[in-house]
């Protein structure tokens, strides 16, 4: 048995301390053969009483990734494979290197991030971002291709599509002028820094985007334990 009204099962994980706006349906199924008529009551208790007790204050992008070493654009890229380098040599967690960005994208990222930081907000509307994309590429798009993360807000959704490009996950610091690294995506998805990802860079981004955030999974497990311990 699952809830009759699936709206009951929809959660925004940013309300549970994940630094990301991630809405998902979390289904809890209970066997009527085992729980009998209590199944309905238990489901309502899980969604209405227990799970909401694990809500936390919203965490921002800045809180989640702001302490990571800065990665600044190089004046000249290296073999069209490396476009950024660490600004300092302090300890750096694994997978904290950005994908390669060409000079055009680096300039666009810097401009858009500075537009937000300065408060000008010339590119705050969807239409202005569409026009920018067309002016740069000569192509039309029904959706805006660029999005800068805001330091004082949770991130937008971290999707599996991130393996294709990072245009919708631009770092908020204009001086870094880049999209987010694997480690930054992992932090926004609730992975600890000692979690190791295997495969190519694209595989790692896809793995992170497809994951159920482990931090949120732990909260669901704790709420479920509370529900079942007295059954």
Q: Model regions: which residues?
A:
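C-terminal target-recognition/interaction regions appended to catalytic cores
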Residues: 77, 81-231
